[in-house]
Amino acid sequence: TLEAISSWFTRAEAPEIAEFSFGTAIEIASRSANVTAVVSDEPGIAFNGKHLTSFVDVMYVLFENAASKSGLPREKLQVTASLCEEPAGSLTLRVANNCEMVADVGAANAAIDYYRDAYGNDDVTRTVIQQNGGSGIFRIWRCLSKDIGIKHTIEFGYESEGLFVVTLKMQEPTGVLYHESIAR
């Protein structure tokens, strides 16, 4: 029936989880992407459980992009993820992966300037998603900006000939953090 078919494309409403850790989102996303990710730094903070799916989506995109764009077989891929709480209160997420060596770091970074320049631009994002079937980087923007509603910046590119890094800085993350006193 039409009702059954439409349910295939609707996310099931799961019982809400009160809180989750960064490590939980990493574990779920890395298993889904079939990527081994090492958590190199994790502050002792908890996120509001209603944002688990969105954070897993963000991490999944980062891991899947690492696997599909690195030019390496998955068994040779090395992914590290870290989350740091900055003194000003922002959170910095850094995901790094090894990749096939690039001859010219500057040229390789210039080749992805379009994505950097377009990130956060609603009109360009819609066009890219419609034409290209959706770029992962724009799915990250949608999850963080639209689904979670957190102000953020993103930097990504080749740090060296064999290392690609994505850094997300989330400003004023209090809305996504779990506060026990508020949850009661």
Per-range role (PLM):
Residues T36-N48:
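Conserved catalytic submotifs in the C-terminal HATPase_c
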Residues H51-S82, R142-C143:
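Conserved ATP-binding N-box helix of the HATPase_c
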